[in-house]
A protein has these predicted regions:
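Catalytic loop of the DD-peptidase/beta-lactamase superfamily, centered on the K-T-G motif
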Residues: 1-157
Length: 157
């Protein structure tokens, strides 16, 4: 239940700040189907490697971003708006390389792309359904994300 709109949300952005400015905002999480998010992320990966173009980013910008990700410090940081894994305990889990960029969402969504290994993972969840006021929901998703990523890595290795 959204406190601002005073109803359950379905099929619309849940991020309050994005909603306040019209529903589309770069900081907000992922909104779409897992297939659609995965296909767009795959096009970004190809774009990073100069193999194609993306509707959302030019090849030049993608390759510049990839070079920044390769030089990102070992501690968690951001690369042109993308998150990088934090050492020690990252929502990406323990198997993504330091040449990885990703994005997390308020509702528990997650996208990580390993630019070197060309592996991407998408998790779409709604931890705030039906009510964001459950105190365990944020701790639960922080625990769950790396568990899912680690298990997928174990399955594909």
């Amino acid at each position: 239940r959204c406190p601002w709109r005073e109803r359950l949300l379905q099929g619309e952005v849940h991020d309050d700040n994005a909603w306040l400015i019209g529903g589309v905002c770069g900081h907000a999480g992922l909104f779409g189907t897992a297939r659609a998010v995965g296909l767009e992320a795959a096009s970004w990966l190809r774009c990073f490697h100069g193999e194609s173009t993306s509707s959302l980013i030019s090849t030049d910008v993608a390759q510049w971003m990839m070079s920044l990700a390769r030089r990102a410090p070992m501690k968690g940081s951001f690369v042109l708006g993308w998150d990088t894994p934090s050492p020690g305990y990252s929502s990406a889990g323990q198997y993504f390389t330091r040449h990885t960029v990703g994005h997390l969402g308020f509702t528990g969504t997650s996208l990580w792309m390993d630019l070197e290994q060309r592996i991407l993972m998408v998790i779409l969840t709604n931890r705030v359904y039906p009510d964001r006021n459950r105190s365990q929901s944020i701790q639960g998703i922080r625990w769950l994300r790396p568990q899912i990523h680690n298990e997928i890595w174990r399955l594909i290795q």
